[in-house]
Amino acid sequence: MDSCCNSESLETIVEEAIHLSSTDIHLQCGEPIYLRHGDGLKATQFVCTTTLIEDILRRCGIASYEWQSIDEACSCCGVRIRVHLYRANQTICGTLRLLCHQQLKLDDNSEGQLLQKLCESHDGLLLVCGPTGSGKSFTLACCIDYINQTMERHIITLEDPIEFEFKPKKSLIHQRQLGADIKSMSDGIRDALREDTDVIMVGELRDRETLEAALHAAETGHLVMATMHTQRAVMAVHRMISLFPGEQQEEVRNQISQVLRAVICQRLLRWNKKFITIRDILLNTHAVANLIRTRKEPQIISIQETQLPMKTLEMAVRDAKVQYGSQQQLHTLLDQQLS
């Protein structure tokens, strides 16, 4: 590895990131370390060194680093960290995402109660969507923790990498990592069907093969929970259908209309060192299922607007404005979510 200047330990850097409510740590060997703070990057007094990189690799269980990029996870200061290392500018660089270090617990409000009810389902597909950094993984982890605390279930998680570690409580939990324990997400789902599994958590539905396996699992009596990268709840329905060729889409529409439980699409806003979550909520009622089957997804929004507890992103923004009163800067931040 390249030689670099001296720096502080990973613990010191992570503690600084936590103190500043930063979400990401940016590394380039021999250069100052940057923290993602709000909407911008802030340079720190710390410098990235080979010792720091080697410590991160050791925590990830990796003996050496050559040319390939690395996606792993490790722990530091009681926080799980998603690690991405890569080469740029002829040296080693990295981005460390600090996964939410709050206690895993569903909110004590109507949305939290809705998620609890969805977690109690015995089958079907529950999607948590949103852009990068919107807290999708944390929400899914809270759902898994709720099931683990309250129900006797066999839970299998399929992740890349494992982000939140669970110890069995009322439930039996097996966590599998892509590359280490399974060859692909779709293989992991198919394996889970032969392992007397009740709940399957898929880190992300990225491709047709994974979605196909997830829909089959949801059809055959398993609760499947997964994330997708979409900006709106209704867009998740369109995204799933669009992953299949035209001649399969009618069959897939029927499948989705039968197994989909809900789509929760969320945004995470930072305000006064706290996080505000706003959620676009879509439940698969009979009316919604009929619109999915008959290729009328654009009309789903009108159902969201009139049938509680469903809501659109616009409604979620209005609710947040009412909740937080006359804080104009926050209102501006909320309005930006609609642009």
Sequence positions of predicted segments:
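Short, flexible helix-loop junctions that flank or precede catalytic/ligand sites
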Residues: 2-339
